[in-house]
Every structure is written in structure tokens, then in C-alpha cells.
Amino acid sequence: MPIGNLGNNVNGNHLIPPAPPLPSQTDGAARGGTGHLISSTGALGSRSLFSPLRNSMADSVDSRDIPGLPTNPSRLAAATSETCLLGGFEVLHDKGPLDILNTQIGPSAFRVEVQADGTHAAIGEKNGLEVSVTLSPQEWSSLQSIDTEGKNRFVFTGGRGGSGHPMVTVASDIAEARTKILAKLDPDNHGGRQPKDVDTRSVGVGSASGIDDGVVSETHTSTTNSSVRSDPKFWVSVGAIAAGLAGLAATGIAQALALTPEPDDPTTTDPDQAANAAESATKDQLTQEAFKNPENQKVNIDANGNAIPSGELKDDIVEQIAQQAKEAGEVARQQAVESNAQAQQRYEDQHARRQEELQLSSGIGYGLSSALIVAGGIGAGVTTALHRRNQPAEQTTTTTTHTVVQQQTGGNTPAQGGTDATRAEDASLNRRDSQGSVASTHWSDSSSEVVNPYAEVGGARNSLSAHQPEEHIYDEVAADPGYSVIQNFSGSGPVTGRLIGTPGQGIQSTYALLANSGGLRLGMGGLTSGGESAVSSVNAAPTPGPVRFV
């Protein structure tokens, strides 16, 4: 795609031809400029020093903005950065899975697990939280290439790569390696703490050197007893108690509102009183009615022969009234008796019904609720007692080991007849001790966490000695049978530790490895005070005297 003219060119109407690409291993025209006739030739046609480290996640973002142009140079890295001397590879800032994981967890260890769909996920941990990313096939292949033992545990080693890129190496337990090395160097102590008065380094004639090694171990143990509230049986018991209390309350409310009320005392009437009252009332009523009819009265005849009512009822009328009044009294008596019986029956029926309801509600409500309360209380008590007797202790022990090395080296005079054969050894050991002094090892009885041994190393990035692999040196020393006995001297003589063995074995084989790998050179702590190289010193005849390893 042509680029328009943005300047005040007289040929402003013409288009500027596209710029030639800077090809990498993949031709620039094939990446985005399909159909371009521009070939990758010319002065900028060769970029052999740079090649893509891997398929970057950012390659698909803007590589097709301008067809024919090369990949962004930030996505190109030196081919030699893929594998370094530490047996790892470099992680670019390409927003890929490993770059994202390193951003999240920093310089720490992570593991690789196979997911259900067949993909591989890198899982790290930070502040007790797991961070998981899905690896690309290229990253998984790179991790497999350095993980020869198939541990699937790796570690970010900080910005030790080019341009501050982090490195990925296979994780190893540095505490276990240190214990094995100390057990080899000091069999009597079995890898324990080394006494301060033992100097395992040789001091040459004509030099005054005092070395004091101190190992300070700090152990912090925190024990947390799990609470009984974490036991689900305890909460079941508490729930039973709460349900029982709720049942008691519901039963009381139901008995107060929903049950048959307590009946009142039955109202009774005296039958005799009722009969007398009815007889008297009936007699009065019939007498009044009888007086209304004059024929019912007796008649008196005066002197003139006239019939005059006497105001008295006839005898037969009086007898009828008395008979009817008596019958009315008997009826009233019978009604009073029946009324009393019905009232008593109603009272008894209501009282019996209430008693049945009370017994039923009390048996179900109060009985069940009380049973729940008792069962919950017993369950809570038993659970608490068993928890106190068999409570699991969540114990976490963290041990931090710091090694502090202090060295004071006096004058080194070749004219005094001595060759300081341990100057390189001191320099190498000091370098390793200084790295070990800031590397902390944490372990726990409930965790298999492997802490990165290179995460906090503050060595110079461009220092050649800081980039030398040291694990194989420790393994050589620990596995060498000649480097197994330490002789201690006491008295007025200098404190030196001499290693029993033959020249070329033990620590001298370590010197040879360092010399062959470029670790010992002139001006960096050679084996001789002169200009001989480390190789010539190793191959030369042993120097008689206390400097020699006999």
C-alpha cells in the first residue's frame, strides 16, 4: 500500500514507493505483503544476527498495518538468547502466557499441569493465591527442552536475560543440595552446622588471611488449633437446639390461641325453687282469670231476694286452680333438673376436649422440642469434648538460613617464597557464599514449595563469573571421593583445612572445570600470583609445602 506524501515536495501529486522490508527468518513479503514485487535484497537484506525468538503473541496485533514492512524490531531477539548457560531460556515481554505469569507472580517457582482438554497450564502462587495461564505449544516445547528429568517445575530467575528479560530455569531444591554438600564435606557433622573454628580453605605462604564463617538459623513455628466451629457436627447440634427452642415457643402460642378455651363453671337452678315459683305464678294467673267471670264466684242473696257476688271463687274453681298450679310446678321442677344436667354435660365435654388438645400439643410440641434441645446439647458437648481431645493442629514451620561471610586478606608477597594457590578458591567461594548469604530457603511441613535460588541475587549482569553454572560444580565436589576428609589444625600455627586426596581430584578438579569454562582468568583470581593460567597451574607439578593438597 503506497504511503502518501506528507511534505512540501514539488512532486506532491506523486506517491512515495513502499519501503523495502527488513526480513527475518520469515520473508517480510510473505508476512503481510502478499503479491509485492519487492524482494528482500539490498543493503538491508541480511539480518542474520537477529531472528524471532518464538511466535510472539504480539505478532498478530499490528504486523499487517502496512503490508511489506518488516516485523517490529522489538519482537526480534538474538538467537543465542533462546538457551543460556543456566540451562534455561529467556521470556520476552510479548504479553504471552509466560510473560503474563511472570508479571503476576514475579521471580518465583511455578509448575506445569495437563488440563482436561489436553492443553498445558502453568500454575504459580503469590500471596496464597494460585495464578494459572494456558501455555502455547511453543512455550511448552521450550519448557520440555530444558526439563530433562520431567519434573514439570520451573522458576523465574528475575531480569537476568537480555534487556531485563526474565529467565526460566528448572526448579531445584537448593536446601537439599546444600545439605548433601555439607554432608559430604563434613561426614561427622552429617551436614549440620559447621564450627566457626574450622577453616576449609587453604592459605598460601606469605599471605595473612582470616576468615570467619557464621551460619545463623532462625526457626519460626506457628501452630494454629482449628476451632470447634469449623466442625459441621457442632453446627448441626446448635441447629437442633435452636429448632427445639422454636418448637417450645410455637407450642406455647398455639395452646394460648388455637386450643379450646377453658369452660366456665356450669350454671345450676334449684328444682324446688323453680317448682314453687312456677306453682305460685300459675295459681295467681289462673285466679285472676277466674275472677273475671262472675259465674266462678259464690252468690249471696240479700233481703230483697237479689243475687250479689260474694268475691269468693267457687270451691270447684279453687280446686282446679290448685291442680293446674301444682302441675305447672312439677313441669318447672323437671325443666330445672334437665337444664342443670345439660349445663354440667356441656362443661364436662368442653373440659375433656381441652384436656385432650393440651395433651396432644404438649406431647408433640413440648416433647419433640425438648428432645431436640437435649439432643443438640448432648451433641454439642460431645463434639466439643472430642474436638479438644483429637483436634487437628495446623502447624507451619518456616526456617530461614542466612550465611554471613567476612574476609580480611593481608598482603600477598611472591618474594616470600609462597604461591597463593587458594586465591582463586577464596574468590570463587566468596562469590558463592555471597550469593548464598542473600538466598533464603523456606520450607514447610505442609508444602513442597521450591523457592527460586536466583531470584534475589544481586550480582552484576555483565559479570562473566556471575553467569557461570554452579550446580555441576557442587555436584562434582560432592560426588568426588577425594574431597571427603577435612584436617583441622590447632595451636600456634595458622588455621588451615587441608583436603586429603591426590592432585587433580577434589577441589582441583573444580578449578579445572572453572578454568575450562572461563571462570578463572588472569586478573580474576588465578591459581598463581604470576601470569600463568589456571590450566597450567593445574597441570604443573605440585608445590611442596602446606599449600599443596596431599
Swiss-Prot record:
Biased composition (Basic and acidic residues): 185-200, 422-434
Consequence the record notes for mutating residue 453 to A: Lack of pedestal formation
Motif segment (Essential for NCK-independent actin pedestal formation): 452-454
Free-text function comment from the UniProt entry: Multifunctional protein that is required for efficient pedestal formation in host epithelial cells during infection. The extracellular region acts as a receptor for bacterial intimin, allowing the bacterium to attach tightly to the host-cell surface. Simultaneously, the intracellular region initiates a signaling cascade in the host cell, which leads to actin polymerization and formation of actin pedestals at the sites of bacterial adhesion. In strain E2348/69, acts mainly via the host adaptor proteins NCK1 and NCK2.
Species, as recorded: Escherichia coli O127:H6 (strain E2348/69 / EPEC)
Sites of Phosphotyrosine modification: 454, 474
Extracellular side: 255-362
Cell location: Secreted; Host cell membrane
Effect of residue 452 to A: Lack of pedestal formation
UniProt topology in membrane: Multi-pass membrane protein
Gene: tir
Alphabetical UniProt keywords: Host cell membrane, Host membrane, Membrane, Phosphoprotein, Receptor, Secreted, Transmembrane, Transmembrane helix, Virulence
Domains (record comment): The intracellular N-terminal region interacts with host alpha-actinin and is not required for pedestal formation. The central extracellular region (amino acids 277-332) is involved in bacterial intimin binding. The intracellular C-terminal region binds to host NCK.
Family listed: Belongs to the Tir receptor family.
Protein name: Translocated intimin receptor Tir
